Amino acid sequence: MFKVFRKEMMWGGRKLVLETGKVARQADGAVWASYGDTVVLATAVAAKAPKPGVDFFPLTVNYQEKAFAAGKIPGGFFKREGRPTEKEVLTSRLIDRPIRPLFADGYRNETQVIVTVLSHDLENDPDIVAMVATSAALTISGIPFLGPIGAARVGYKDGQFVLNPTLEQVEASDLDLVVAGTTEGVLMVESEAKELPEDVMLGAVMFGHREFQPVIDLIIDLAEMAAKDPMAIPAPAYDKDAVKTRMAALIGQDVRQAYTLTVKQERYAAIGAAKLKALETMVAEGTAPEAVASVFKELESDILRGSVIETGKRIDGRTTVDIRPIVSQVGVLPRAHGSALFTRGETQALVVATLGTNQDEQIVDALEGEYRESFMLHYNFPPYSVGEAGRMGSPGRREIGHGKLAWRAVRPLLPTKETFPYTIRVVSEITESNGSSSMATVCGSSLSMMDAGVPLPRPVAGIAMGLIKEGEKFAVLSDILGDEDHLGDMDFKVAGTEKGVTALQMDIKITSITEEIMKIALAQAKDGRVHILSEMNKALNTAREAVNQNAPRITVINIPKDKIRDVIGSGGKVIREIVEQTGAKIDIEDDGTVKVAAVDGKASEAAIKWIKGIVAEPEVGEIYEGKVVKIMDFGAFVNFLGSRDGLVHISELKNERVAKVTDVVKQGDAVKVKVLGFDDRGKVKLSMKVVDQTTGEDLSKKEEAEG
């Protein structure tokens, strides 16, 4: 019934298996891939004809993790998987980025890739095997995919690169880098590092590229057995060269003139006018509108790229290494815990840091198990930032991806929870955008956290690099504009400190990027990063000495483990009362660590005093303040140490005979008592008569001194 094709190899110490022909046979391409005990199914399906009127490639990648893969039942009311998690969105982007440039020119059929995690061994992150399976599924599908690609994860520990480290090894590694590409070159890099030098980062990229070559060979071997006939791509219904020649004669000079305008809005208006002129004239001459739109993009790209290669001058008049003017401000929002406004040319980010307690941590339910995240960074890109009116809603894939990149860039500099027990949320509102808004977020995040009093050892900055390559000639561009990103060959984002790189993200549209070009780009990025850091330092070069006055003050105390239940109380009664009475937030951990947080210092002091009173043991001979809580014929019960009560016997009320307890004290009276000792049941025996009720002086010691 099944015609199964299978290929396998040992890779990075584990067996990689690719199989097709048994599952999802109605998809154009389907590959069942396993690595260790992690199993994914990747499918690729394409529409049989292109979408009419579409001038772009409609590709969708959906990566999904099934709870059953880790032997779990989903939480929530419905007990089934819901909207994509952040991990699923990020992995979908990770798969999409290296495959998108490899589809044939002119291919416009709607294409969907679905990757499903079916088994997770809790050792290998499924993202690498998902990328490999996707590459294999596309390669055998007949879809015009000019792959295959390979992918690998690279760690770095004790001066050695590690291929496909386990989840446990990644935690201990100085580097977590994912690289993907073809036999010829690297197409995509995503990484987080602990301030590593540029040569180590480049070495990791090239190490990964070498190590995934056998995977590409394995996919080719599978395709030789199982690949379907390639899909035919219809030839354009027009003569592209003729249309391009006519358009260049008609508006070529207008487009060149438009690209001399340094203000983005003016430039876009001029380009729009040139495009409209071409459309009206050439459609009237009989050219199809879609032909005009498609060729206009090529003409625009040729003019921009040729100008940079020939003159070394860019759209806004800068040289290839110049950084746009930078203005940094901190403390721009009076009630925020930390805030910064970072402006670089026409890109601007308003970044705000907020400090919270353990109760504000994000609870993440992942396949690997539930964990708590104490650092969050959220990136928002409203339509007004590019002068447009658009939809507002939940964050899209791009916003989630940009936020995660900035999160990776800053996280290696964060203090430990032991030294800074706060939950940190950073929000970046992009208020203007013309390229490199994610790197503006990195700069603004660093400034806002230092403004909030987060003790970062050094500021962090980021820069976006670009590349234009024509034949053997190339130009590496520092601090790219939006147009240079869209029309260039590379988007290369580097973030770090003066010591080294903390995050690196690379997307390359061509396969001929050499190691030498990447080396030049990294060196140029370092120079740019150092310049940006020097500009940021003019606003704030080190963290504030204390957290902002509007932020909660967290005080950490330790109590004996056997006293935790006393502080919490039956059903949480005691801790609720402390919180309600003092206004402080209280977190108690299993090891007896207690974190008390309050904006008002007095509230924090009151809560700490209360807790210490509960856990403190009364000492014989010590004098305490207390309150009469119960009257009996034989004496009065006094609450004197947190929730602890003791008995003042009627004979210990006064230095004279007392007929009735109520003659001396009444319920609710504030009194001063001395601990005499404990009875045989452990109950505390107290005395009032040996304490001066006005001054709190120990009268028994006074008598001894006088005697």
Curated annotation (Swiss-Prot):
InterPro entries: ExoRNase_PH_dom1, ExoRNase_PH_dom2, ExoRNase_PH_dom2_sf, KH_dom, KH_dom_type_1, KH_dom_type_1_sf, NA-bd_OB-fold, PNPase. It is an enzyme of class 2 (transferase). Residues 621-689 form the S1 motif domain. It comes from the Bacteria. One of its GO terms (molecular function) is 3'-5'-RNA exonuclease activity. The gene is pnp. This is Polyribonucleotide nucleotidyltransferase. It catalyses: RNA(n+1) + phosphate = RNA(n) + a ribonucleoside 5'-diphosphate. It comes from Rhodospirillum centenum (strain ATCC 51521 / SW). One of its GO terms (biological process) is mRNA catabolic process.
